[in-house]
C-alpha cells in the first residue's frame, strides 16, 4: 500500500472513531493487547493488589483500565495531565469517590510521601524518584510501556 492510501485510510478511521479517554473500542476485534502479548498486565496487578492496599494509577487516561481493576474507590487515587482526559476523570472518577488529581507523571506527584502500597502506570510518563517518594516501604510499582 502506498503512503497516500494509508493516510486516507487513517483519516477515514479517525473521522468515525469516538475516542474518549483511553477507550479505543473502535478497533475492537482487530487487535487485542491482552491476547497479543505474552503477559497480561491486569492479571499481574491483580496478583499483588489486595483490597486494603492504597492504589495510585499515574496517567490514568480516562480511568477505564483503573475502573476495570474494581479496587475499593476509597483506596484508589489517579493522576492525568491531558486536558480532555482531566475533564473526563472529573466527571467519572470523582463522583465515585476516587481521589483524582490533575498532574503529569514525569513531574512531582501531588501526594504525600509514603502514601501508597502500589503504584501502577500503563503507557504513561513516570519519574522514578517520585515513585520512590510516594510508595510505602516495601511498596510495589508495576508499569507497562509501549
Predicted feature descriptions by range:
Residues 49, 70, 134-135:
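A generic alpha-to-beta junction signature in SAM-dependent methyltransferases
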Amino acid at each position: 500500500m502506498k503512503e497516500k492510501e494509508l493516510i486516507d485510510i487513517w483519516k477515514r478511521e479517525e473521522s468515525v472513531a469516538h475516542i474518549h479517554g483511553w477507550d479505543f473500542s473502535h478497533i475492537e476485534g482487530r487487535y487485542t493487547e491482552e491476547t497479543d502479548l505474552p503477559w497480561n498486565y491486569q492479571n499481574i496487578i491483580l496478583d499483588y493488589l489486595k483490597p486494603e492496599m492504597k492504589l495510585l494509577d499515574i496517567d490514568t487516561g480516562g480511568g477505564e483500565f483503573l475502573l476495570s481493576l474494581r479496587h475499593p474507590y476509597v483506596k484508589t487515587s489517579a493522576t492525568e495531565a491531558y486536558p480532555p482526559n482531566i475533564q473526563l476523570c472529573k466527571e467519572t472518577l470523582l463522583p465515585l469517590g476516587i481521589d483524582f488529581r490533575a498532574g503529569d507523571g514525569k513531574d512531582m506527584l501531588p501526594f504525600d510521601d509514603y502514601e501508597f502500597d502500589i503504584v501502577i502506570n500503563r503507557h504513561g510518563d513516570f519519574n522514578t524518584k517520585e515513585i520512590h517518594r510516594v510508595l510505602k516501604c516495601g511498596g510495589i510499582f508495576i508499569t507497562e510501556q509501549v
